[in-house]
Every structure is written in structure tokens, then in C-alpha cells.
Amino acid sequence: FGPRIMNSTAHDSCAEYLINKFRDYGLKVTEQDAMLDGYDGTPLKVKNIIASINPDSPKRILICAHWDSRPWADNDPQESNHKKPVMAANDGASGIAVMLEIARLSSVDSCFISKIKFGIDFICFDAEDWGTPQWEEEDNPDSWALGSQYWANHPHRSGYTANFGILLDMVGGKGARFYREGFSDYYASGIVDKVWSVANSIGYGNYFINSRGGTVTDDHKPINEILHIPTIDIVPYYPDCQSSSFGPTWHTTYDTMDNIDKDVLSAVGATLLEVIKNIKDE
């Protein structure tokens, strides 16, 4: 599709693809449309996509990621690229890929996930990455995560809640390691403990580092603060990367498939499946 930027044909085409994929896997899909203002007042045509397994089950968990692309590669090492769009293979597609694979497995009779009794809501948040670009003098923190802010204030179901939530952001980059994110520890340390323990128990402790990383304004923040659903962020932390603690391709023209590591994606996906399996067995 190319960059999935709001108000573009690529954005519309990608939304249609995601909706059809989730429906093909037998999930109930709800579309949430809104017109929201970007950091500079640009009207943005926003679409959150909610895909549900066992939609009528009262016990639910939430798994989410953003699907939009950043319009500007404002952290690119070449200043001439700063106003070019980001392909967003990692920062915009990797978390969605993990969710789609879990949804696919839910349609396979031989997989345990097809037999779970609780509900899972996969939410593809839009407009996460239209935040203030670096060339502006002041950053407005409320200009980020617009889709999740809107959903948290207007849930797709009245009175919606979930036992807990897991946000996936940039979960496919080369060299990615996932440290305990600050807001996650503040609002949902028990969920962080559970997920990191599961990762370690199945051999992925080298990816999930049980130490504090950064504190990230991300889609989990409004979910915690507005809906009070304890939600964590699986997000990479590169302590030795000079260009960004999110890694060398963050908000650059290098966020492409060439820089995706399937082993990182597998570690995150396998950990999530094991977390879900443990809920089933509780």
C-alpha cells in the first residue's frame, strides 16, 4: 500500500484489507470513524478497527497496535528526507502483523486459541503517529495517539472494559529488545511481570529484558488513564542508539521490510500466544 497516511488512498486501501482479513478469520469487525484535528489543525479522516473473538463473552483481554504511518521522516539522518513519508514496516505494521497471525490461528481448529471461552479484542488504532514533528519549536504530547484517545473516550461498546491490555509497538526491528516501559510499570506492573515471566519461561528472556527502559507516550496511556484498563506497552528500547532510544530506523526512510527481523516478531508472537494459553488454563 505504501505509507498509510490519513486522507490518502493507501490509507483507505489498507483499512479495507485489514477489515477483510479479520472477517476472513471469522472475527466480528467494528469500524469506528472520526474526524480529528492533527497537531497543526489539519482535519484527519481517522478509522479505528476493532476485531473481536467471542464478542459476547464478559471476560475480555485487549491486544492493540497502531496501523497508520508517520507522514514525515523527521528523524532521518538526511535533512532532505525529513518531509518524506515513512514506510512504517516496523512502526505501524509489525504489531498489526502479530495480531493478524493470532487472529488467523483462532480460525484453525487444531489450535488451542480456537477453543478459548473468553473474548479477545484486537484494536488497530489510527492516527498514533501524527504527533508534532521535530522541526516545530514545541511538542504537544496530546497530538500523539489521537485514535486511542478517541476510542478511550468513545469505546466501541458502551461500558467496555477488559481484564487487561497489551499494546504492540515496533515489535519487529533488528536488534530490538523489550525493557519494562515506565507507564506500563506504573499502571500495570503485574501484567508486565506476567508477560516478561512467560517470555523467559519459553526461552525469550534475551528479548524481554527485566529492567526499566524508557517512559513512552503511546496508545496505552489513554487506555490506562481514561478507561482504567491495566495496559502495558511492548516497545523496544535501544539504550546505546545515538539517533533514538526507539532504534536507528525510527521515523526515518529506513523503516522498511529490509530492517525487519522475523525472529523478533516470532518472540513477541509466541510470548503473546503463551500468555493467552495461560489465561485459558486459569
What is each stretch, according to the model?
Residues 30-31, 50-52, 60-65, 88, ...:
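Structural recognition of the beta-strand scaffold that forms the well-ordered cores
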Residues 35-39, 55-57, 67-71, 127-131, ...:
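Solvent-exposed loop/turn segments at secondary-structure junctions
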Residues 2-56:
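A non-catalytic alpha/beta surface segment that caps or lines the substrate-entry region
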Residues 1-9, 36-40, 81-93, 111, ...:
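Second-shell loop/turn segments in exported
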Residues 9-29, 94-101, 146-150, 161-163, ...:
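Extracytoplasmic/secreted proteins, especially bacterial periplasmic and envelope-associated proteins
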Residues 59, 71-85:
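Glycine/charged-rich beta-loop-alpha catalytic/anionic-binding loops adjacent to active sites
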Residues 83-190:
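Acidic/histidine-rich catalytic neighborhood of metal-dependent amide-processing enzymes
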Residues 33, 164, 171-282:
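Active-site-adjacent substrate-binding region
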